[in-house]
Amino acid sequence: MTMQKHTLALVTEDNDKYLSLLTQRQLPDLEICGVGQSASIVLAAPPKLADSLDCYPEVQWIQSTYAGVDALLEKANTPRFQLTNVKGIFGQQISEYVLGHTINHYRHFALYKQQQTNRDWQQHHYQSLNGKRMAIFGTGAIGSHLANVVKALGIIPIGINRTGIPPRQSAFAETYHINEVNTLLTSVDIIVSTLPNTPETHGLFNGDLFAHCRGVLFFNVGRGATVDTPSLLTALEAGQIDHAFLDVFINEPISQECPYWHHSQVTVTPHIAALSFPEQVVDIFAENYLRWRDGFQLQNLVDFDKGY
């Protein structure tokens, strides 16, 4: 029996790389086509595909190369295809980002490097990570991986999600419903947001929430729209936040006039906390394609109503 052929279009930042990797895979019954109307599958970076989504009227499945798919959800008011994202590959990178900045902050490594240039021999009091309490907003794959990593260094990971129920076999010492966080925040040292942008999380980190903080380190590696910028700046001035490490923003790149650029208590990075490596994405796509081809449910399906 002849199997149905499936056509794949590539709309990524590096189509040549993806084409090479997919050609090596020789996935059965899959043909890679150019930009056009015949593609039944699209492997895409959401921002690149969003404006050309109408060019693929026959698409049945879109595999995102990102974890976040906001750009596509905004365009797909009436879902006519299945959408999957990439999961399970960003936890290590996010953990490295958060721990790297946290250790640098508490141990003053950047300050010592500056002193070195001035031949300045001066010791500074520092803090150990042991016993620090880290509130991790989002207990999915990324948050759970981060909890496992920081626990090994003596940090107490606290999970915050929509249910108050910890994931199975997780390292979270405590887990709270997102509506219960205000009293919790008075006792934490570090806040990490891995949250997606949904109606429930939009502007979640605002003045009411920050008012309960006591000189915390704040990381946003989730989505920029979860943070209210004026409230964050006010919290920094009030000492509720000691330092903010921001990797995601509502508009990227941020404008030249953005107050974050020159704020001494803000570290800005250009959305690099966790990048999608083509090799990892192709591994996920290949496994999902075989499931889809054989009639099984796709993995990492995005719920259009929830937004993730």
Regions found by a protein language model. Give the residues of each.
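Glycine-rich NAD(P)-binding loop of Rossmann-like domains
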Residues: 112-145, 174
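Rossmann-like adenosine-cofactor binding region
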Residues: 164-259
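Short loop/helix-cap segments at secondary-structure boundaries that form the rim of catalytic
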Residues: 19-23, 35-38, 52-56, 71-79, ...
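Phosphate-coordination loops involved in phosphoryl transfer and adenosine-cofactor binding
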Residues: 4-5, 80, 130-133, 215
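Conserved beta-strand positions in the Rossmann-like core of class I SAM-dependent methyltransferases
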Residues: 158
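Phosphate/diphosphate ligand-binding glycine-rich loop within oxidoreductases
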Residues: 40-113
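N-terminal glycine-/charge-rich "phosphate-binding" loop or analogous flexible N-terminal tail
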Residues: 1-41
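C-terminal helix-to-coil terminal segments
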Residues: 84-85, 89-97, 111, 252-308
